[in-house]
């Protein structure tokens, strides 16, 4: 498998990216919203296999204090190949020099991210657009 990596936004098919998140499965993400999010991200990577988008990730970063890795996804056909690990490693490498690198991930993947040195934070809090849904999905709790 020969993969092509890029951080360029110029040839991204935002509908294809939306379909990747749906298939991963990481939910429904609007193509226009994805374009805004990735365009606003300091670091990003898109991975192609034979012109098909198979993996993606991004990080919001300020260049000094904090880099925030999020929206990492791999197409099911390429899950288990080490691609997700490579995407995270690439974003961590790009984020080097920041005082902290924060990661947002789906529940149940903590062991995977510990391999990169990530530790669970005890001080993080969030306000979601739909607090009840976030609670239902286990993303937040009352404590």
Residue ranges, per PLM feature:
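Conserved acetyl-CoA pyrophosphate-binding loop and the N-cap/start of the following alpha-helix
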Residues: 47, 78-87
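Short amphipathic alpha-helix that is part of the acyltransferase structural core
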Residues: 1-32, 124, 137-143
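A conserved beta-strand-loop-helix scaffold within acyl/acetyltransferase catalytic domains
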Residues: 33-73
